[in-house]
From Swiss-Prot:
Main location (coarse class): membrane
Enzyme Commission number, as recorded: 2.5.1.141
Localization: Cell membrane
Biological source species: Clavibacter michiganensis subsp. michiganensis (strain NCPPB 382)
Described purpose of this protein according to its UniProt entry: Converts heme B (protoheme IX) to heme O by substitution of the vinyl group on carbon 2 of heme B porphyrin ring with a hydroxyethyl farnesyl side group.
Pathway entry: Porphyrin-containing compound metabolism; heme O biosynthesis; heme O from protoheme: step 1/1
Name of protein: Protoheme IX farnesyltransferase
UniProt keyword terms in alphabetical order: Cell membrane, Heme biosynthesis, Membrane, Transferase, Transmembrane, Transmembrane helix
Positions of transmembrane segments: 31-50, 55-77, 104-124, 125-145, 168-188, 218-235, 238-258, 286-306
Gene Ontology molecular function terms on file: protoheme IX farnesyltransferase activity
Length: 306
């Protein structure tokens, strides 16, 4: 093979690899990881033991495609503000690694594929819930709430709670009080998880007129709201104990993890009211660790003999 041909092949290979990486980035894989953390444990709880491993794998694949579709639509819709905000400068529609058309077609393809896949691999209730999650995230949160109200993440966060319902429905074919409580745990957890991040990137959101709570209210007000939602999350997590018959492992995780999460929110608020330097990302990272610990306990508890 001559040098010119080899060079062209190398460029094409690099181009394909970079394009593939851009498509993956469009789905926001780090967000998807957190969503999947809640899915598999709920399936174990719904089964009261290990479900069929192929069902778990199939639902996780479907959930990945579904969340990826919603995130890709979000990137397409928000491409105008992503070009202005510093923290989104490396997204593929900003860098030009993907065209607008490529992103939109990709979002549609994996979205439709996720619905069909979940319907075939599990049941059509799970598929319908997945469709509802995509539609809610795209139309209610991204197109309606995000740029209009500081409560955007409160109500828009409902889309991120859907994986627990999807996981439960995939196993049982219905919805009961236990998954509703799990839904509410994630719903109440979302604001104190996301608001600290918006405090760090307050200037970014202000530059594009997105009315995040950190933009329209002071640090102390945001800190107080974070405390209230963290306490509500802890209280809601304890409701699962009598409703789903959770055992010692879950109870300890809910109390210890929830207590730590609440402590970090109080610490953030105390620094804010004293006008001292704050570290909102401590709460952000603590919230991720807390939710992961809690749902790990959700999955472990049904497998134990006590």
């Amino acid at each position: 093979m001559n040098v010119a041909v080899q060079s062209r092949v190398d460029r094409e290979t690099i181009g394909v690899a970079r394009k593939t990486k851009a498509y993956v980035a469009l789905t926001k894989p780090r967000v998807i990881e957190l969503l999947l953390v809640t899915t598999a444990p709920v399936m174990i709880l719904a089964q009261g033991g290990w479900p069929n491993p192929w069902l778990i794998l199939g639902v996780l694949v479907g959930g990945t495609l579904s969340a990826g579709s919603a995130n890709a639509f979000n990137c397409y819709i928000d491409r105008d503000i992503d070009r202005v905000m510093k923290r989104t400068q490396r997204r593929p529609l900003v860098t030009g690694e993907l065209t607008d058309r490529e992103a939109l077609v990709f979002a549609w393809i994996i979205g439709v594929a996720s619905i069909v896949w979940l319907g075939v691999i599990s049941n059509w209730l799970a598929a319908a819930l997945s469709l509802a999650a995509i539609l809610f995230y795209v139309f209610v949160y991204t197109l309606w709430l995000k740029r209009r109200t500081p409560q955007n993440i409160v109500w828009g966060g409902a889309a991120g709670c859907m994986p627990v319902l999807i996981g439960w429905a995939a196993v049982t074919g219905d919805i009961s009080w236990a998954p509703v409580i799990l839904f509410m745990i994630v719903f109440l957890w979302t604001p104190p998880h996301y608001w600290p991040l918006s405090m760090k990137y307050r200037d970014d959101y202000a530059s594009v007129n997105v009315p995040m709570l950190a933009v329209v209210r002071g640090r102390a007000a945001v800190g107080l709201q974070t405390i209230l939602y963290a306490w509500a999350t802890l209280a809601c997590s304890l409701l699962l104990i009598p409703v789903a018959g959770m055992g010692l492992v879950y109870t300890l995780a809910a109390l210890a993890g929830g207590g730590w999460f609440v402590y970090e929110t109080h610490r953030l608020y105390d620094l804010a009211v004293r006008h001292e330097p704050i570290k909102p990302m401590r709460v952000f990272h603590a919230s991720i660790s807390y939710l992961s610990l809690l749902f790990l306990a959700v999955g472990i508890d049904p497998l134990l003999p006590f």
